[in-house]
Amino acid sequence: MSFAAHTKKELTMMEGADCCSKAELSALIRMNGSLQFGAGRLVLDVTTENAAIARRIYTLIKRLFQIHAELLVRKKMRLKKNNVYIVRIPNKANEILQDLGIMDQSLSFIPGIAPEIVKKSCCRAAYLRGAFLAGGSVNHPEASSYHLEIFTSYQDFCEALTKIANRYKLNAKCIERKKGYVLYIKEGEKITEFLSLIGAHQALLYFEDVRIVKDMRNSVNRLHNCEIANINKTVNAATRQMENIQLIDQEMGLENLPKRLREVAELRVAHPDINLKELGEMVPSGVVSKSGINHRLRKINEIADKIREKQNISM
């Protein structure tokens, strides 16, 4: 079972006040519901591929409206042959839709999200929970990038959902995607805040544990890469210094260098692997600071560069 599926399973076992259950059910039906006319009346179907979510919808309808809905199971024939679960409400569908803020008394759909359904903070969180159950997904925290999204077919609904999410500073964005619109959250910290908000506390703890280990591992890798880069830089610099000292020795002799440069050149030849600090501590005439050694080696490099320039001119 995927991390997203585990998260949804946890959410379907939550208990809540009637106002919050109504908000959650409103989001579930708003996103996964469809209407049809049968036998002269309005029939509401709520469709999902998740058995736990189907049971959740069935239970909420029964509890809130004292209606026994029908639970149908269909087999998908294309691609993944998963079961499709349909919670069918053959009676009082229009009354339920009006009470949930999805349709008005003239049976016209209410755009976006009805304000009376999400008046309270707890109900806003429950509405986001229902939306996530209906059309949400979240990457496993071990994935290369953090990503949580909720898909909907309607732009106005996506924007309204994003507005609610951002009341909690979740940095949610709404973008158009093929066949619909997506609310998404990219930051690991904001995803944990979203999971906490909708009540997925077990998923949150697991996500945080994995995220902490992952971030520590990434930090260690960055530090290791930085150390390797520094070592390579030091080795390359030492190699260049050795080449320059050998060139000076061949062309003019190290004995003709000023004493302070000759000392450092001879030490570098004798100890090609030590760092500048260690080199400075070995200078015969007295300890020289790291910056002092670096300055003298730059002077040696400049002398070698001038020799090369003369060689190029003579050629």
Swiss-Prot record:
The keyword DNA-binding applies. Keywords: Cell cycle, Cell division, DNA-binding. It comes from the Bacteria. PANTHER family: CELL DIVISION PROTEIN WHIA-RELATED. Belongs to the WhiA family. This is Probable cell division protein WhiA. The keyword Secreted does not apply. Pfam families: HTH_WhiA, LAGLIDADG_WhiA, WhiA_N. Involved in cell division and chromosome segregation. Residues 275-309 bind DNA. GO terms for molecular function: DNA binding. GO terms for biological process: cell division; regulation of sporulation.
